[in-house]
């Protein structure tokens, strides 16, 4: 075609976030100068958020294949075969930058977007989890962010009818100007309903489903997540400038869209389907066309608009929420319209699938043409694959932080502990129930274990699913304190922590997803952290036979040139083969023996490492070395605990009465949490001081049993270390000679700690 508009000024590409080299790449693809519209399309699709141009080379090192994986990375969500003809879809995403600017809408639309990723696969969304990271609560702005984000998640999730079943809540000064809002969603589908985001069938229609298109979210996450905050006073200095890039959500529209899409898929009316997330319509059209090896003509004048006077680039890149793109045959259009009318969902033909174009060299290329009318002027024409798959990939410089050796050498494990261990323990006990009380975790009545425990557990049941006694479990885990010291080992240990949490509810780990939250990739130290973290994840997943079936990379989490600590979040998915009874939970009983299952001492050079521990951080110590990742001993312990708890879930006779993973805060916190859950105390005599109380490393479980001899014998037969700690009873928590607390007073303090911190005004 002839160039449909004058060439763009040379400065425009920079204003859109494209480099000079990237402009040259675009010229080579097109063999001409791009026009304004085409530059805008490349700017959003080649942004860091959409293209992963700084991380994709490294992500290739992650294992993603296994016999039970139905869909791996690259689609809306990963999907595993959970058995009984049921697939489970899982996805995790970040909405960090939008939430820093507009916490309610940023978090709410994060939930909406992740749900669309899941039901685009044909899965009914069944649950949401939310790992959240904020600055310290002595800052009023951080308290405002916490309340806004939690309200946004609860407002959207409760209204759309999907339970929020858990997550994480972390406070650290590094997130003061750049909070992290990650959202994980899980859904289930009959495997016969599995859908993919592929356009095929020449002459088929591209149908836009859902909300009107407006200017909200123009260049939203694709721009916000591709640059840091520049203000020295944090995000506040640029809030107003970037606020229009934050999308606005409507959960009731989303609910209707879910039901309409699932009914369309049930009837077989849909050839391919994809949500409109980051980069909006241009992302959905270019990606579906590229996957199908076809071209697509899109009529911008056909798109239903909420605002007058929108320009073509605005229509194509708007990130207005609650929209899907479905590829359907002309024969099914009337039936599709009937279903959408039933659910009061707009359905508009905005495009056609077309033959790949014959190029001068004889090759065929699927072109994406943006038109003014289906037979009207071509406003822009680019190869679909060049937008979706061919962004330049950068192997950015990497450098180990120069001060890291000094930080590692400052090891709190070497110190003689000082201070009151009662205060230490009290400062580590925070119940996040204030957050979970705002979420409805029991929607659908399938939640067996909800927020606040090691992992969430749900029955694998829902409308349209085959009957099954199976269940699925989900956990989210992270440890930025560890990752700041040793991102490779720390990420491996975080993967192990996720498997440990699943074991506590009897679930066998099947797959993980990740959300990699890091600072500015243009800083070599940040790229070193990211590369090391990915290698650690690959190491652990290979050792524990876990495929990585999806993920998200969030970069440029910085403010005023200060990067956040590396924060890889691992979402772990497990399956319980027979779920006819709840797992034991934390509810030990008077007279039970309390047993530590797993190696009492850490792998590596230190028996009880305090480096990166919550205990040390609370004392202002952020250095030291971590335990080593030892796959062989971890796997044996995980298999044993999973089997013990799975037997309870299957309704088999068992002496096991309670189980809890030892993680953040160490053994002291695990015992205190179990005591607080029941107001029953325990006395533990033989402990190796502060180190054994507060050291953190995965692979240890506190289990309560009515028959210590039987449990010990089974553990020993499995080759798993085990030691009896004490007996449940009384009203005091006694840990060696260091801790002696009234359980009820401790439980009350723990229950109110977070709300007191939020209400300090």
Question: Which ranges hold each PLM region?
Answer:
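Non-catalytic terminal/interface segments that mediate subunit docking, oligomerization
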Residues: 46, 50, 56-109, 113-119, ...
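Intrinsically disordered, low-complexity boundary segments flanking structured domains
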Residues: 57, 63-67, 151, 169-172, ...
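Mobile "lid/hinge" segments at catalytic clefts and subdomain interfaces of large enzymes
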Residues: 75-345, 349-358, 362-366, 464, ...
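Alpha-helical propensity feature that highlights long, continuous alpha-helices across diverse contexts
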Residues: 1-73, 83
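Glycine-/charge-enriched secondary-structure boundary and capping motifs
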Residues: 4-16, 20-22, 26-39, 177-179, ...
């Amino acid at each position: 075609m002839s160039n449909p508009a004058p060439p763009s000024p040379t400065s425009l590409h920079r204003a859109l976030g494209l480099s000079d080299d990237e402009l040259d790449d675009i010229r080579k693809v097109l063999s001409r100068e791009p026009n304004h519209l085409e530059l805008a399309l490349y700017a959003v699709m080649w942004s860091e958020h959409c293209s992963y141009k700084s991380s994709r080379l490294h992500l290739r090192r992650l294992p993603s294949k296994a016999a039970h994986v139905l869909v791996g990375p690259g689609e809306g969500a990963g999907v595993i075969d959970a058995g009984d003809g049921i697939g489970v879809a899982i996805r995790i995403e970040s909405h960090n930058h939008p939430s820093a600017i507009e916490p309610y809408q940023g978090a709410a639309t994060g939930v909406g977007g992740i749900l669309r990723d899941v039901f685009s696969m044909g899965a009914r969304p069944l649950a949401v989890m939310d790992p959240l990271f904020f600055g310290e609560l002595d800052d009023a702005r951080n308290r405002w962010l916490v309340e806004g984000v939690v309200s946004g998640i609860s407002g959207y999730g409760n209204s759309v009818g999907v339970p929020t079943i858990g997550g994480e809540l972390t406070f650290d000064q590094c997130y003061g100007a750049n909070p992290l809002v990650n959202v994980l969603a899980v859904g289930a589908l009959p495997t016969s309903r599995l859908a993919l985001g592929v356009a095929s069938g020449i002459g088929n229609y591209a149908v836009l489903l859902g909300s009107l298109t407006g200017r909200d979210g123009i260049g939203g996450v694709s721009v916000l997540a591709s640059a840091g905050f520049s203000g020295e006073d944090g995000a506040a200095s640029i809030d107003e400038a970037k606020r229009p890039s934050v999308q606005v959500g409507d959960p009731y529209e989303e609910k209707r869209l879910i039901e309409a899409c699932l009914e369309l898929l049930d009837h077989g009316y849909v050839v391919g389907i994809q949500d409109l997330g980051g980069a909006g319509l241009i992302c959905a059209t270019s990606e579906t066309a590229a996957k199908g090896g076809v071209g697509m003509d899109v009529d911008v004048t056909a798109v239903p608009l909420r605002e007058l006077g929108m320009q073509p680039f605005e229509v194509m890149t708007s990130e207005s929420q609650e929209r899907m793109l479905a590829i359907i045959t002309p024969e099914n259009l009337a039936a599709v319209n009937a279903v959408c009318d039933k659910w009061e969902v707009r359905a508009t033909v905005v495009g056609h699938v077309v033959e790949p174009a014959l190029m001068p060299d004889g090759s065929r290329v699927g072109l994406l043409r943006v038109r003014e009318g289906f037979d009207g002027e071509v406003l822009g024409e680019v190869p679909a694959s060049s937008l979706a798959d061919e962004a330049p990939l950068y192997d950015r410089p990497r450098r180990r932080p120069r001060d890291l050796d000094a930080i590692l050498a400052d090891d709190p494990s070497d110190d003689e502990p000082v201070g009151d261990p009662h205060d230490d323990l009290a400062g580590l006990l925070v119940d996040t129930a204030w957050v979970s009380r705002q979420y409805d975790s029991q929607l659908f009545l399938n939640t067996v274990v909800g927020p606040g425990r090691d992992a969430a557990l749900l029955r694998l049941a829902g409308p349209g699913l085959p009957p099954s006694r199976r269940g699925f479990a989900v956990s989210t885990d992270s440890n930025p304190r560890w990752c700041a010291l040793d991102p490779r080992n720390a990420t491996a240990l975080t993967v192990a922590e996720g498997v440990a949490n699943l074991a506590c509810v009897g679930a066998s780990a099947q797959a993980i997803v990740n959300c990699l939250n890091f600072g500015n990739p243009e800083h070599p130290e940040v790229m070193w952290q990211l590369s090391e973290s990915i290698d650690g994840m690959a190491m652990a997943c290979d050792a524990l036979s876990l495929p990585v079936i999806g993920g998200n990379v969030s970069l440029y989490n910085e403010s005023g040139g200060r990067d956040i600590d590396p924060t890889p979040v691992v979402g772990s998915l497990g399956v319980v083969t027979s779920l006819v009874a709840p797992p034991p939970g934390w509810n030990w009983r008077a007279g039970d023996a309390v047993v530590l299952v797993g190696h009492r001492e850490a792998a590596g050079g230190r028996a009880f490492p305090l480096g990166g521990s919550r205990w040390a951080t609370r004392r202002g110590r952020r250095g030291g070395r971590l335990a080593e990742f030892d796959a062989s001993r971890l796997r044996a312990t995980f298999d044993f605990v999973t089997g013990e708890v799975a037997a309870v879930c299957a309704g088999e006779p068992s002496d096991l009465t309670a189980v809890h993973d030892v993680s953040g805060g160490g053994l002291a916190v695990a015992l205190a949490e179990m005591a607080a859950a029941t107001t029953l105390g325990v006395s533990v005599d033989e402990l190796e001081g502060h180190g054994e109380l507060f050291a953190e490393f995965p692979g240890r479980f506190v289990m309560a049993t009515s028959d210590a001899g039987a449990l010990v014998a089974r553990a020993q037969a499995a080759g798993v270390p085990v030691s009896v700690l004490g007996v449940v009873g009384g009203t005091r928590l006694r840990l060696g000679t260091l801790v002696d607390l009234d359980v009820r007073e401790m439980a009350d303090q723990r229950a109110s700690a977070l709300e007191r911190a939020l209400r300090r005004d």
